A protein has these predicted regions:
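Phosphate- and other anionic-substrate recognition elements at nucleic-acid/protein interfaces
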Residues: 1-131
């Protein structure tokens, strides 16, 4: 099974979740709020791969996205390498800098990925707009 999550920046808004079996038939479709609910459904479905539509890493050199923190990106371009590669191809993407407006989404995605990986799940970051 494959499991996809269109994650929202806050549990106050529902995240769309979809599980596909190996024949690509819908095995699960739902809208979930809390990360715990998402994790519980994933643990019932036991997918081979979990795809999350949210940035799951920070730019190299950053430990956080807080402007008050002295951490700095290693590159003068500030965004992640994958974001720069997309932009080179003319594909826009949300910034992953300290001034980003999707800070909550990034933090939530990273926390969810960490929890799922600790449980032994295979998690990947996806960006459907780019495909």
């Amino acid at each position: 099974m494959f499991f996809g999550i269109d994650l929202t920046s806050t549990p106050a808004k529902l995240s769309a979740c979809l599980g596909l079996d190996k024949e690509l038939h819908i095995a699960y479709l739902g809208f979930l709020a809390a990360d715990r609910d998402i994790i519980d459904v994933i643990n019932l479905c036991l997918p081979e791969v979990i795809a999350i539509d949210a940035p799951l890493t920070l730019p190299e050199g950053l430990c956080c996205l807080e402007e008050s923190c002295p951490c700095q990106p290693k590159s003068e371009w500030k965004n992640r390498q994958c974001d720069r590669e997309l932009r080179k191809e003319g594909i826009p993407c949300y910034p992953t800098t300290k001034k980003t407006f999707i800070k909550d989404l990034i933090y939530r995605g990273i926390e969810l990925e960490n929890e799922l990986c600790q449980q032994g799940h295979h998690v990947i970051e996806i960006y459907p707009y780019a495909s």
